[in-house]
């Protein structure tokens, strides 16, 4: 059996592994503890090493030997890293100019680990889990990275993987991997603009991606390194701490172990409220010997964390603006990351974005119900795509001249019977490209006008229906005219005429648009019955 190429998503908070099984389907691999979203954490007790969920459990009793939130430190000098991200676990120290950790291994022995070594150990655990599941050695992987990862960080990741016998054959950016996995399961029926919003544990990332003929083009990216699921945990911690303090006059924030207990249980409560309308929290001896038992419903949780949810929505708005697009230019928002399970995230985006924008999250039947597995699945699909390439062929296929293709700045399309513009090739379509459309109703002499198009957003104010003069007097004190409604609509207009083609006595027409690698446009119109064709070039 040949060694499969696996897909790995390595996040600050959690990691996932996937591969293409013998039936040619994507399998997301669970570790020996049954975790598919495997916490990116390592913990040490004496000579024993714990990984994943077992390591996270050590945060309460053994925080100084538990390493968390370390992914973003790879390949960066110590002074460029925000080491406060791992403050709840082992404190970061400078080791050889890099982020490192000093771990107690018992009997007075200490071990200094650079972040490179920590990454190697984490990837090795993922590799072993994959080998155990697949039943054969794993030597190669496609690894996802954020769009803002530097070449130095990628090089360091490759080196850490190579140390444990794992070759990174390709990096794929996280939003493209997630969108690839979504489109494999739920194909887009037309060209679309999609925001991929990844809300993780300690950071949020987003990208606006134009999907044209199956090709992805990133139009803009955004990153907020201080916004994530931990912000929701913090709001719950503060709420529960205040309630506990009111009841017992004891402050659980003052004791590190009490605070760690509260954080761990708040995170569990947050996850429970993603699937249920209420949750209970129960902590033995939270502070000053007092036990804490309480319940919270989803509505209260959403009110407590309302400001954070508003920040998530604003973050999506910001990346759309960065792409110099209007929300009406967006067809869908694909939610990924652990926060995506939270229903309030979806409802907020549905409220702030136009109705035409589909929110593709776990609550949508047209989207994956496991958004935190999308990127790993996409990496596995990319691994399948490149598995037949050798190293030289893959390097050739990834040359900038091939990957960085030119794109249309304006849409190209046809003029309708009433002088309206119908786009065929949308803006941001990469070329070379070919697109066909069939007009079966075209009869007789037929003139085809090919134009560039422009689009704009038109706003109309709809005045409310005024109150009737003879309205019931009882209603008068409570009734008032509604506010005017502003309706926004995306409209196309004709731009520059590119060419005209005429067909006589047509009986249905097929029109083929071709743009070559140099940007030359050829349009062919063919009579469906006779096969006669006319061509125009520009």
Swiss-Prot record:
One MF term in the entry's GO annotations? unfolded protein binding
Which compartment or compartments is the protein found in?
Answer: Cytoplasm
Q: What keywords would UniProt list here?
A: ATP-binding, Cytoplasm, Nucleotide-binding, Phosphoprotein
Stretches for region Peptide-binding domain: 400-538
Q: Name one GO cellular component term.
A: plasma membrane
Point out residues bearing the modification Phosphoserine: 477, 480
Q: What does this protein do?
A: Component of the ribosome-associated complex (RAC), a heterodimeric chaperone complex involved in regulation of accurate translation termination and in folding or maintaining nascent polypeptides in a folding-competent state. RAC stimulates the ATPase activity of the ribosome-associated pool of Hsp70-type chaperones SSB1/SSB2 that bind to the nascent polypeptide chain. SSZ1 is required for ZUO1 to function efficiently as a J-protein for SSB1/SSB2. Also involved in pleiotropic drug resistance by post-translational activation of transcription factor PDR1.
What this protein is called in its record is Ribosome-associated complex subunit SSZ1
Which organism is the protein's source? Saccharomyces cerevisiae (strain ATCC 204508 / S288c)
């Amino acid at each position: 059996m040949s060694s499969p190429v696996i897909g790995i998503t390595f996040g600050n908070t959690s990691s996932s592994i996937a591969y293409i099984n013998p039936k040619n389907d994507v399998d997301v691999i669970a570790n020996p503890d049954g975790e598919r979203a495997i916490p990116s954490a390592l913990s040490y007790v004496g000579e024993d090493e714990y990984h994943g969920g077992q390591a996270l459990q050590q945060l309460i009793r053994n925080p100084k030997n538990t390493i968390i939130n370390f992914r973003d430190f790879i390949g960066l000098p110590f002074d460029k890293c925000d080491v406060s991200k791992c403050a709840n676990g082992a404190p970061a120290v400078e080791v050889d100019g890099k982020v490192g950790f000093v771990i107690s291994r018992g009997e007075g022995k200490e071990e200094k680990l650079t972040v490179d070594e920590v990454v190697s150990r984490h990837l090795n655990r993922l590799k072993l889990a994959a080998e155990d599941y697949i039943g054969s050695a794993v030597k190669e992987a496609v690894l996802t990275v954020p769009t803002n990862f530097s070449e130095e960080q990628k090089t360091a990741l490759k080196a850490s993987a190579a140390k444990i016998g794992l070759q990174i054959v390709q990096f794929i950016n996280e939003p493209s991997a997630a969108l690839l996995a979504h489109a494999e399961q739920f194909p887009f029926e037309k060209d679309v603009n999609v925001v991929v919003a990844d809300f993780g544990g300690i950071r949020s990332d987003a990208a606006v991606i134009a999907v044209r003929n199956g090709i992805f083009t990133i139009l803009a990216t955004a990153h907020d390194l201080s916004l994530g699921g931990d912000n929701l945990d913090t709001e719950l911690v503060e709420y529960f701490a205040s309630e506990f303090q009111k009841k017992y006059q004891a402050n659980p924030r003052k004791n590190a172990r009490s605070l760690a207990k509260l954080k761990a249980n708040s995170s569990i409560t947050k996850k429970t409220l993603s699937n249920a309308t209420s949750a209970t929290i129960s902590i033995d001896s939270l502070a000053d010997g007092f036990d804490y038992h309480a319940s919270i419903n989803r509505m209260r949780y959403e009110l407590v964390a309302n400001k954070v949810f508003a920040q998530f929505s604003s973050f999506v708005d910001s990346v759309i603006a960065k792409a110099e697009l209007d929300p009406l230019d967006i067809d869908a928002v694909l939610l990924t990351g652990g926060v995506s399970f939270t229903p309030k995230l979806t409802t907020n985006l549905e409220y702030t974005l136009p109705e035409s924008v589909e929110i593709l999250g776990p609550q949508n039947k047209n989207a994956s119900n496991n958004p935190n597995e999308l990127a790993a699945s996409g990496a596995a699909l990319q691994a399948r795509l490149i598995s037949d390439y050798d190293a030289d062929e893959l390097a050739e296929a990834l040359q900038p001249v091939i990957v960085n293709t030119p794109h249309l700045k304006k849409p190209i399309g046809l003029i309708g019977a009433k002088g309206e513009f119908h786009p065929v090739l949308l803006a941001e379509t990469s070329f070379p490209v070919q697109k066909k459309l069939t007009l079966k109703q075209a009869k007789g002499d037929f003139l085809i006008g090919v134009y560039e198009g422009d689009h704009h957003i038109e706003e109309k104010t709809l005045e409310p229906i005024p109150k009737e003069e003879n309205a019931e007097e009882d209603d008068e004190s409570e009734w008032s005219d509604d506010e005017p409604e502003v309706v926004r609509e995306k409209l196309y207009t004709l731009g520059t005429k590119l060419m005209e083609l005429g067909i006589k006595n047509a009986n249905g027409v097929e029109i083929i648009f071709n743009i070559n690698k140099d940007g030359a446009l050829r349009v062919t119109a063919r009579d469906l019955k006779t096969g006669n064709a006319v061509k125009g070039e520009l």
